[in-house]
């Protein structure tokens, strides 16, 4: 969408309308109507003749359309004239094949921005803008504005049906623009507008048609591996009655494996081809999903190459290639041990999380608890051993200190005795002293 524009005009309605009428060559018919103050009748003639603006010289296109937009917004019923203006702008600008898209885009954006933010007419204009973007394959220009759509719909007080129409239009524009993720996202938003408590509504032809389209997009997408958001929609549940084979196929992609997919093909021979689905793409996707399930259900987090080859129905020499592919798809994280011929799982994505997964989680928690209990036991034993060793060392140290103290005491006692005896000997009188 183009940058918002302001319109600067000067003159009375009659003067400006006559100027516009002359430009689109209906001046003679409009003049008497303006003289009689029949503004709406005059404007009606001008708008009907405004298709000629698409052939106006490039330099005159924007000023002329700005003037026409100003006149229409002065009307008592802009709603009456805006569809014609928008429809004309969706047609080729013959006077400027090179810049026609930009000129028309600017005019459409000007209409949108000059309407009050809460004016419901904005909804219709925005629908035309989306269609214009789609037919010119310029979805990237629209994408930054889509973050405002939900807020706009609330401001316009759009009902569920109107919201659905807009979301489908945006989904179509994204699809034609090659943005499959955005297309799928807005298709799901469209499906969410059906009243989930109204069984007739979710089972209606429109709901089933959109649900089937979303299902086909989901299973065919090379990057989409989570189908729970789709499966949670009541209109998709209703496919089990209106399109049971498609519903069965969705169940397989949601929580089953490659073997189930192959059984499905055998049961419904030729169906995938007749429905214009690509078997090679579906089979590849099922192999990746099967790998993810295998990784999620492996208790010891080590998957032998042979188990991978069997589950994916591939030669042993292709195991490493498929492992790399599943890691790139972000379904699994881990590393290959070529020496041990195993894949070491670090992280895996659960495709669904139901009773089976809760049981698996419980088993893993029990295993983890056992490991933790063992570690705690080892740590406690080590602590006990350390404390015992420390106590033995303390006792040994005390014993040595005690022994050392005793020996020193005895030595000091012996030395004192020797000195006393010597002193006595020097004082003792002998016969030789005489």
Swiss-Prot record:
Record-level GO cellular component terms: eukaryotic 43S preinitiation complex; eukaryotic 48S preinitiation complex; eukaryotic translation initiation factor 3 complex; eukaryotic translation initiation factor 3 complex, eIF3m
Species of the source: Neurospora crassa (strain ATCC 24698 / 74-OR23-1A / CBS 708.71 / DSM 1257 / FGSC 987)
Family: Belongs to the eIF-3 subunit M family.
Localization annotation: Cytoplasm
PANTHER family with a match to the protein in the record: COP9 SIGNALOSOME COMPLEX SUBUNIT 7/DENDRITIC CELL PROTEIN GA17 (PTHR15350), EUKARYOTIC TRANSLATION INITIATION FACTOR 3 SUBUNIT M (PTHR15350:SF2)
Domain PCI: start-end pairs: 179-350
BP-aspect Gene Ontology terms: cytoplasmic translational initiation; formation of cytoplasmic translation initiation complex
Region (Disordered): 387-434
Function, in words: Component of the eukaryotic translation initiation factor 3 (eIF-3) complex, which is involved in protein synthesis of a specialized repertoire of mRNAs and, together with other initiation factors, stimulates binding of mRNA and methionyl-tRNAi to the 40S ribosome. The eIF-3 complex specifically targets and initiates translation of a subset of mRNAs involved in cell proliferation.
UniProt subunit comment: Component of the eukaryotic translation initiation factor 3 (eIF-3) complex.
Transmembrane segments: none
Protein's UniProt name: Eukaryotic translation initiation factor 3 subunit M
PROSITE patterns: PCI (PS50250)
Record's keyword terms, sorted: Cytoplasm, Initiation factor, Protein biosynthesis
Annotated Basic and acidic residues bias: 387-401
């Amino acid at each position: 969408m183009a940058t918002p524009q302001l319109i600067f005009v000067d003159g009375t309605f009659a003067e400006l309308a006559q100027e516009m009428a002359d430009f689109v060559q209906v001046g003679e018919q409009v003049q008497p109507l303006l003289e009689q103050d029949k503004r709406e009748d005059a404007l009606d003639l001008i708008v009907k003749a405004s298709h000629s603006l698409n052939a106006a010289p490039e330099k005159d296109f924007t000023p002329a359309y700005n003037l026409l937009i100003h006149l229409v917004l002065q009307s008592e019923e802009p709603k009456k004239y805006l569809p014609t203006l928008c429809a004309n702008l969706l047609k080729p600008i013959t006077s400027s094949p090179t810049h026609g898209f930009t000129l028309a885009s600017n005019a459409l954006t000007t209409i949108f921005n000059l309407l009050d933010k809460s004016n419901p007419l904005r909804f219709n204009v925005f629908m035309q803008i989306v269609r214009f973007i789609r037919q010119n394959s310029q979805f990237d220009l629209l994408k930054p504005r889509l973050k405002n759509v939900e807020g706009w719909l609330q401001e316009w007080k759009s009902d569920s049906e109107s919201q659905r129409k807009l979301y489908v239009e945006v989904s179509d524009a994204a699809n034609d623009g090659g943005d499959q993720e955005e297309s799928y996202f807005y298709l799901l938003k469209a499906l969410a507008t059906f009243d989930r408590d109204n069984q007739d509504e979710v089972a209606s032809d429109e709901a089933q048609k959109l649900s089937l389209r979303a299902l086909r997009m989901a299973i065919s997408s090379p990057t989409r591996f989570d189908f729970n958001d789709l499966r949670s929609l009541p209109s998709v549940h209703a496919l089990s009655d209106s399109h049971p084979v498609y519903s069965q196929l969705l169940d397989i992609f949601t929580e089953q494996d490659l073997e189930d997919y192959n059984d499905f093909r055998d049961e419904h021979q030729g169906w995938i081809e007749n429905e214009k689905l690509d078997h090679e793409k579906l089979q590849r996707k099922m192999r990746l999903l099967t790998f993810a399930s295998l990784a999620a259900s492996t208790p010891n987090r080590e998957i032998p190459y042979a188990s991978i080859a069997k589950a994916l129905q591939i030669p042993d020499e292709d195991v490493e290639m498929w492992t790399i592919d599943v890691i790139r798809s972000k379904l699994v994280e881990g590393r290959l041990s070529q020496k041990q011929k195993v894949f070491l799982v670090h992280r895996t994505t659960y495709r669904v999380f139901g009773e089976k997964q809760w049981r698996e989680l419980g088993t893993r928690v029990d295993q983890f608890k056992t490991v933790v209990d063992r570690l705690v036991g080892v740590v406690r034993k080590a602590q006990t051993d350390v404390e015992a060793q420390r106590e033995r060392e303390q006792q040994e140290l005390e014993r040595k200190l005690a022994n050392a103290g005793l020996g020193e005491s005895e030595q000091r006692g012996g030395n004192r005795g020797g000195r006393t005896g010597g002193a006595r000997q020097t004082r003792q009188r002998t016969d030789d002293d005489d």
